[in-house]
């Protein structure tokens, strides 16, 4: 406290001292009372210390972080008076654990409640995925035409089978990045962009939007030639790597000659 015996009592300074005591992190309640006496004002500071910390619990039902890990973080503080400043530093350690494993939407709030037995409960929201929505973009970068969603060539199930991020799973940045790499590996898309939005009907959950720019998957080739067996001939080749929007690869080659006509058709179903 900055107020000392012999100093003038100032309410503003008293308020600052009160806040400083709270800020030390050791107390759950602080109250300053005054008594008038023959030699001046006597200040009585009543404090309620925090309880002895015995256990820290996470309330999340989908917790990635184990109870054992939480105990390991706080074990040196179990059996000592709870200091909220030191406690917050340890919460940051748990947050970094979530982040390092890719759970970047995890949020830890608290302590919500400190009971008299020294058990602290932390409120954890880990960012559960409500839905994964696909939006196809045109060359203009828009996902709608006259207010209606733009339809893509590729079937939705072809895209979603590449995704390990599913409704009901906990959002994981590393898993989603791997999902995007698999989508690029299909050679069906020029660009894949990700955005996140809250689910208004399910607070604490998130909707993932994938904005997809499809690339051209068909090619047509042709030519003229001459051979002893066919004479003058014309060739035509048609290749499509996303037939019927199912990621099927088709290849058709036609050769028209003076003496013969040949063709070759292949279909690869992935």
Positions of PLM-derived features:
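Conserved small/polar residues in nucleotide/adenosyl-binding loops
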Residues: 268-270
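Periplasmic polypeptide-binding modules associated with outer-membrane biogenesis and secretion
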Residues: 1-232, 237, 251-266
